[in-house]
């Protein structure tokens, strides 16, 4: 008994040590502060062995496109022009001049490629495909059919092709059906709910976001390192806007194979502060925040219904099958919240405590993905499923005696009931 007690205490201590706060995680790797620009992290998770006799036979996923260029030309040009004008007026420090050079290089690199997939983004999806093939070989064996669909955006189409080409290289016998059509956009990238749009622009949301900006944007130290003239800085530069613009460029530079960087402009504390701005913003506008009545994830009801309906047609097939979908983080994050994967559905009015539980970089990095993997056993009609978030097993809001595997009938019933409640 004493030995068991000591072992329990030791386990608790290990768990306490291993459970890092968001601040500690960002201080350990500032790239996490990039939020939705965070490059897909290395996968080290081990897959739990399924119950005896169960084999995977169907995989259904929704993946975000891989790493990309920033979308809007102004993302590069606005901070660049601020620094150019300051240079023309002779008020940049040495670090300011160096920053100008880096911004100019990034602007030229991005010209004509705004929003496009980078080579790293393609590699991310090839890696995901290779691990799917390795982890679930039974699904991709022989002349299996794979239905792969993308939104109509080029970076998503190229992400789809990268993943499919890698699977084809691993098994040339695989048969693919690829599509990217406006016909499927009602569930692949739905954005037509006026109620959701109105809630995101409500006075309460605007006030909350403005308060968050005031709390977490502190540009004074950074500006002093870039500008030698405080009067010029005061009258000619929107310091807060420049700081966040520089941080966006710095954050997304991990999407490229380049030795250039701007993260060194920021202290780790500033990186954490600016990430909180992003984390809270995404939580309010796309997550289950009480400020938006927890309704934001419902925007992905069509996508969840498609996942359920498609699964119903595939689990009765005798052969294996895969359904691959490629879209955006603005769909992936609310889908994870709608599914209540792990703590994605966490709700709190206290935003100061939000990042103790809810951290956006764990949900939707570049190439982020949700995989439903279905298992069956010969002689049994009890289908099992597990759900992976970025290739890591998750906890579902359903009871199970074989977790992280769940009985499909229980999972489907839970989500069907949830969809029905949303549409009343």
Predicted regions and their residues:
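Signature for phosphate-centric chemistry
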Residues: 20-122, 126-147, 151-323, 327-424
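Bacterial Sec-dependent N-terminal signal peptides
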Residues: 1-23
């Amino acid at each position: 008994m004493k030995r068991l007690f000591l072992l329990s205490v030791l386990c608790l201590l290990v768990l306490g040590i291993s459970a890092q706060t968001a601040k500690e995680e960002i201080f350990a790797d500032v790239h996490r502060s990039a939020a939705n620009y965070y490059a897909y992290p290395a996968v080290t998770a081990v897959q739990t062995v399924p119950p005896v006799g169960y084999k995977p036979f169907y995989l259904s996923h929704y993946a975000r496109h891989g790493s990309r260029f920033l979308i809007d030309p102004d993302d590069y040009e606005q901070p660049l022009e601020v620094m150019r004008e300051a240079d023309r007026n002779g008020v940049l420090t040495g670090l300011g001049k160096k920053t100008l050079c880096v911004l100019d290089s990034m602007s030229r690199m991005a010209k004509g490629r705004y929003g496009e997939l980078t080579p790293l983004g393609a590699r991310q999806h090839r890696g995901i495909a290779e691990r799917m093939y390795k982890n679930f070989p039974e699904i991709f064996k022989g002349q299996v059919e794979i239905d792969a669909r993308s939104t109509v955006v080029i970076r998503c189409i190229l992400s789809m092709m990268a993943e499919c080409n890698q699977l084809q290289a691993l098994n040339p016998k695989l048969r693919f059906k690829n599509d990217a059509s406006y016909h499927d956009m009602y569930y692949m990238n739905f954005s037509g709910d006026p109620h959701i749009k109105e809630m995101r622009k409500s006075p309460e949301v605007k006030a909350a976001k403005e308060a968050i900006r005031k709390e977490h944007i502190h540009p004074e130290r950074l500006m002093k390192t870039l500008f030698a003239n405080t009067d010029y800085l005061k009258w000619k530069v929107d310091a807060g806007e420049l700081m966040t613009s520089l941080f966006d460029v710095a954050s997304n530079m991990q999407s490229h194979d380049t030795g250039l960087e701007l993260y060194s402009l920021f202290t780790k504390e500033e990186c954490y502060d600016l990430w909180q701005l992003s984390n809270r913003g995404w939580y309010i506008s796309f997550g289950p925040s009480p400020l938006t009545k927890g309704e934001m994830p419902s925007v992905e009801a069509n996508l969840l219904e498609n996942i359920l309906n498609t699964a119903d047609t595939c689990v009765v097939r005798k052969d294996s099958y895969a359904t691959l979908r490629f879209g955006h983080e603005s769909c992936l994050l609310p889908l994870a919240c709608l599914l209540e994967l792990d703590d994605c559905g966490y709700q709190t009015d206290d935003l100061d405590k939000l990042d103790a539980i809810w951290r956006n970089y764990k949900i939707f990095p570049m190439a982020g993905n949700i995989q439903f993997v279905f298992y069956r056993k010969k002689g049994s009609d009890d289908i099992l499923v597990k759900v992976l978030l970025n290739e890591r097993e998750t906890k579902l809001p359903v009871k199970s005696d074989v977790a992280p595997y769940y009985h499909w009938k229980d999972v489907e019933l839970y989500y069907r009931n949830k969809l029905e409640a949303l549409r009343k």
